[in-house]
């Protein structure tokens, strides 16, 4: 079910107001945000755990002259209401697919270049594998979960290390704001399915061209792990962005956009 949402200004700083709508299915609702640019490639942005589409702010700003952007807030994150139970990663991908099918019918949105950050990369991998007609290319930014550290204790340790490893102020401010909106209860509910999902089992099924991006100081999904991710992709490439950690999408959105655009042209 699709519900139109009233446009408001202010959340995304200097960005123009997007078209907004909600999509609900089976007690789970996600919010969609679209910056239309007819004739340009359509990008779908899927955020990580504890976050919302605001984490892509700088990436969106850099991409707007070159692309149409559709960003989502997954159930319980950003502007989307919290459901009673957390979906698996695969079921989350199916919810996103249903929302995009509806958007294709109602708004004429074509094949997508799907971009996922952290947990969002897990969702994008499932989406690309299950719906090759919908996803033309995939970008996996800091894809979780590192197979060598798939426990709550290890992930918590790495998140703390990453937080205090020279993270830029903008990444801290946006990250704290989004985590506070999510709240610890829902974060932990969604963390279970995130840790259970094995992205390495899905990667060989992704037949589209795929780009893996990671910050050189990422402690949560380090470059060594992302190299393994790229190797598992039939048509994968890896780029390491100098400097930033796990929230490089926030701190280095412009650099990420530049690399993605260069990849599309190659």
Feature roles, as predicted:
Residues 244-253:
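Catalytic histidine-centered segment of alpha/beta-hydrolase-like enzymes
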Residues 206, 212-214, 218:
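Short beta-strand/loop motif that positions the catalytic acidic residue
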Residues 23-28, 33, 71-113, 258:
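Active-site loop/oxyanion-hole signature of alpha/beta-hydrolase fold enzymes
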Residues 31-79:
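Conserved HGGG/HGGXW glycine-rich cap/lid loop of the alpha/beta-hydrolase fold
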Residues 122-130, 134-166:
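Flexible "cap/lid" loop of the alpha/beta hydrolase fold
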Residues 173-201:
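Hydrophobic, aromatic-rich cap/lid helix
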Residues 1-43, 64-67, 261-266:
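Alpha/beta-hydrolase fold catalytic core
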Residues 208, 222-230:
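Short alpha-helix in the alpha/beta-hydrolase fold that links the catalytic acid
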């Amino acid at each position: 079910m699709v519900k139109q949402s009233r446009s408001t200004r202010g959340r995304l700083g200097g960005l123009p107001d997007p078209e907004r709508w909600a999509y609900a299915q089976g007690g789970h609702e996600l919010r969609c945000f679209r910056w239309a640019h007819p004739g340009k490639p359509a990008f779908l942005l899927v955020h990580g755990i504890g976050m919302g589409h605001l984490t892509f702010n700088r990436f969106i700003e850099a991409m707007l002259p070159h692309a149409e952007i559709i960003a989502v807030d997954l159930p319980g994150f950003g502007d989307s209401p919290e459901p009673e139970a957390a979906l698996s990663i695969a079921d989350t991908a199916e919810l996103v697919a249903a929302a995009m099918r509806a958007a294709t019918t109602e708004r004429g949105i074509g094949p997508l270049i799907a971009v996922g950050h952290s947990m969002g990369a897990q969702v994008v991998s499932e989406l690309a594998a299950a719906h090759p007609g919908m996803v033309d290319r995939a970008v996996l930014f800091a894809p979780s979960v590192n197979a060598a550290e798939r426990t709550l204790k290890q992930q918590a340790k790495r998140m703390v290390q990453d937080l205090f490893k020279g993270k830029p102020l903008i990444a801290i401010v946006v990250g704290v704001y989004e985590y506070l909106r999510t709240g610890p209860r829902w974060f932990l509910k969604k963390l279970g399915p995130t840790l259970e999902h094995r992205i390495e089992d899905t990667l060989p099924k992704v037949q589209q061209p795929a780009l893996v991006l990671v910050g050189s100081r990422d402690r949560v999904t380090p470059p060594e792990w992302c190299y393994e991710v790229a190797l598992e992709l039939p048509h994968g490439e890896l780029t390491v962005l100098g400097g930033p950690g796990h929230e490089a999408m926030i701190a280095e959105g412009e650099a990420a956009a530049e690399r993605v655009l260069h990849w599309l042209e190659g």
